[in-house]
Amino acid sequence: MSASGEVSTARDYIGHHLNNLQLDLRTFELVDPNSGGSATFWTLNIDSLFFSVVLGILFLYVFRKVAVNATSGVPGKLQTAIELIMGFVDNSVRDMYHGKSKVIAPLALTVFVWVLLMNVMDLLPIDFLPYIGEHFFGLPALRVVPTADVSVTLSMAIGVFVLILYYSIKMKGIGGFTKELTLQPFNHPLFIPINLILEGVSLLSKPVSLGLRLFGNMYAGELIFILIAGLLPWWSQWLLSLPWAIFHILIITLQAFIFMVLTIVYLSMASEEH
């Protein structure tokens, strides 16, 4: 094979694995990834939606089953692991959230475990599920890491943003929240436009940074796995993929933890009365 042919094959391989399984909501037809068309507002990444929902259901099922069958005696391995996770999350909430709410701890647990499960999908062999999807179901493309899709991470961040607004208005009232936006940092009516711009940018930057941070790290990790699989011979891929997978375990756990911590911190800031 010529050098240009090898480059073309590697380019096609990498491009194929970066394509989502998309549904055009205007025609309700699957989008052909080879058509050269770009994604629009009316395009839905159904693979990201499918895997995120399935992993969310898996999380609820496993935790509910363990809670129902929990015993006060010697716990099993799964119950022990879940108790450790719940204790870790509960301690994190106690350290960072200083208000009183029965929602924050369950929310933090859901965010941490759900994001972690979606991140773990990046450890699967890069061709495993796409091969099954293509040869058994005729799917033109399939991406299995929901958090490597910016629409998923920003959707979760927008959910957190809605909670930030809710707790800000709940704790401070509409008047207090309005004063916070218009009379800080300069407490003078003449500076209301400047204050509004500064506080508005600060407020909007929270969901944007929250979503893009998770997306950027997971997209980069996924891309490295794809590059290893697409550019190296099969017999040498494990020399890089195995060490990277071991290191990536730390990354996916850390990113889930950071997303949870920032969620707690933002809600704690919103709940503080001034």
UniProtKB/Swiss-Prot annotation:
One CC-aspect GO term: plasma membrane
Cited Gene3D superfamilies: ATP synthase, F0 complex, subunit A (1.20.120.220)
Gene Ontology BP terms: proton motive force-driven plasma membrane ATP synthesis
Alphabetical list of SUPFAM superfamilies matching this protein: F1F0 ATP synthase subunit A (SSF81336)
HAMAP family xref list: ATP_synth_a_bact (MF_01393)
Subunit relationships: F-type ATPases have 2 components, CF(1) - the catalytic core - and CF(0) - the membrane proton channel. CF(1) has five subunits: alpha(3), beta(3), gamma(1), delta(1), epsilon(1). CF(0) has three main subunits: a(1), b(2) and c(9-12). The alpha and beta chains form an alternating ring which encloses part of the gamma chain. CF(1) is attached to CF(0) by a central stalk formed by the gamma and epsilon chains, while a peripheral stalk is formed by the delta and b chains.
Similarity section: Belongs to the ATPase A chain family.
Name assigned to this protein: ATP synthase subunit a
Source organism per UniProt: Photorhabdus laumondii subsp. laumondii (strain DSM 15139 / CIP 105565 / TT01) (Photorhabdus luminescens subsp. laumondii)
